[in-house]
Swiss-Prot record:
The gene is RFPL4B. GO terms for biological process: innate immune response; regulation of gene expression. One of its GO terms (molecular function) is zinc ion binding. Residues 76-263 form the B30.2/SPRY domain. Keywords: Metal-binding, Zinc, Zinc-finger. It comes from Homo sapiens (Human). Pfam families: PRY (PF13765), SPRY (PF00622), zf-C3HC4_4 (PF15227). This is Ret finger protein-like 4B.
Amino acid sequence: MAKRLQAELSCPVCLDFFSCSISLSCTHVFCFDCIQRYILENHDFRAMCPLCRDVVKVPALEEWQVSVLTLMTKQHNSRLEQSLHVREELRHFREDVTLDAATASSLLVFSNDLRSAQCKKIHHDLTKDPRLACVLGTPCFSSGQHYWEVEVGEVKSWSLGVCKEPADRKSNDLFPEHGFWISMKAGAIHANTHLERIPASPRLRRVGIFLDADLEEIQFFDVDNNVLIYTHDGFFSLELLCPFFCLELLGEGESGNVLTICP
């Protein structure tokens, strides 16, 4: 499931997620920049599809940018249907995740339904304390496929994903070697693998998390834009893995925004 989703959302030329996708007459889809570069390397403006090797006839260069708008318009409905299909597939694995207050930092407060968390206001020197306030979700998983969504809204700094149980949640070292597989926002969006930057908008508001414990993968989606933004792989599926949520502590005079697990 996870591998197929990634393949559907990736360009066969650059092997990255589609950027301004375009469909050729043979119906294969590529990034616009990738296929334009591929075709323009042939001086008579004829090229074969990189996948099926069918010859693709291309309009004159000055017409290319105009014609691509028409092609993109024709693709819009089918791409939207594909995005909705992927989203519906993910929701077949939807879990009723809530926050486990028994595992929480004392600096967090929760809604009555245990779906929302917020940092308390604090008024002391943060340099003497851990910068993070964390909590686990429930249930935890050791096998199978599981999906949940988190509304991060206006929260300035957050970390989401899974961690093995037990793991040292009081540490600031939230890295895979310590049992954490997460994405985080601290200005830009990053993965916790050597702080690798993720090509996602800093205005990302809702994050979808798909855990395939059998394939040892966790995928992160920009739900509003139906985009896969990152994949962690290679962790041990025999571990008990718990949903993980973390908010940065507040400085003096700051007020915290709410992080919410979507029902």
